[in-house]
């Protein structure tokens, strides 16, 4: 019933990840490439690699040709295929590059907003998805609705503005929009939503929020 507060939990995660980034780059002055690798590694380690596991399974399912049921079966098996490795590499390398492209002085704020945006995307996905009957994502999907999504988006956008001005709102909005994109992709390929799609959406939405905020800042 508290799925709508996930962006604010993401904010707490973002404070920790952002503080780590500040330590690595601002205080210790490590080279930006090494720092980006350490920050991204810390981020996925801190959340227990759960979302990364979902991303790999999602990639495997996306590579399968056939019915949604066949795709879900592949997504749920324990083996790792080429699709999973490819998605892991693509999302990972772009996220790493985005962190490495961030202005050092702003690293804390960018990382903080990106984690809020990632969770904003997850609850957007949950709002518009139909759950798999015995999937772990069912509990999150059933507790979300459009009113709660709007409330969460307004509050998260306000926080984003306080953290990073207009670019903070842009990052949060990107999280919401990318959540809708994941919904459309998942419905086309799987019809029903699973916990693996939830995990994949977190990684994709964080990446897209980072990319768009940094790109616009550099303009």
Can you say where each PLM-predicted feature lies in the sequence?
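Generic anion/oxyanion-binding catalytic loop in active/binding sites
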Residues: 60
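Juxtamembrane transmembrane-helix boundary signature
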Residues: 49-54
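Hydrophobic alpha-helical transmembrane segments
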Residues: 1-48, 63-70, 77-78, 84-219
């Amino acid at each position: 019933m508290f799925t709508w507060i996930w962006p604010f939990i993401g904010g707490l995660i973002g404070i920790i990840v952002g503080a780590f980034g500040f330590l690595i780059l601002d205080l210790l002055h490590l080279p930006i490439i090494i720092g980006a690798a350490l920050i991204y590694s810390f981020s996925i380690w801190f959340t227990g690699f759960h979302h990364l596991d979902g991303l790999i399974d999602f990639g495997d399912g996306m590579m399968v040709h056939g019915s949604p049921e066949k795709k879900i079966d592949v997504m749920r098996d324990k083996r790792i295929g080429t699709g999973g490795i490819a998605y892991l590499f693509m999302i990972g390398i772009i996220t790493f590059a985005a962190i490495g492209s961030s202005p050092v002085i702003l690293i804390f704020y960018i990382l903080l907003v990106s984690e809020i945006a990632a969770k904003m995307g997850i609850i957007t996905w949950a709002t518009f998805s139909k759950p798999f009957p015995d999937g772990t994502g069912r509990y999150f999907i059933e507790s979300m609705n459009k009113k709660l999504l709007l409330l969460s988006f307004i509050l998260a956008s306000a926080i984003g503005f306080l953290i990073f001005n207009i670019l903070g709102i842009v990052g949060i909005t990107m999280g919401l929009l990318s959540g809708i994109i994941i919904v459309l992709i998942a419905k086309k390929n799987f019809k029903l939503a699973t916990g693996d799609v939830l995990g994949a959406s977190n990684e994709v939405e964080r990446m897209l929020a980072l990319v768009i905020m940094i790109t616009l800042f550099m303009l």
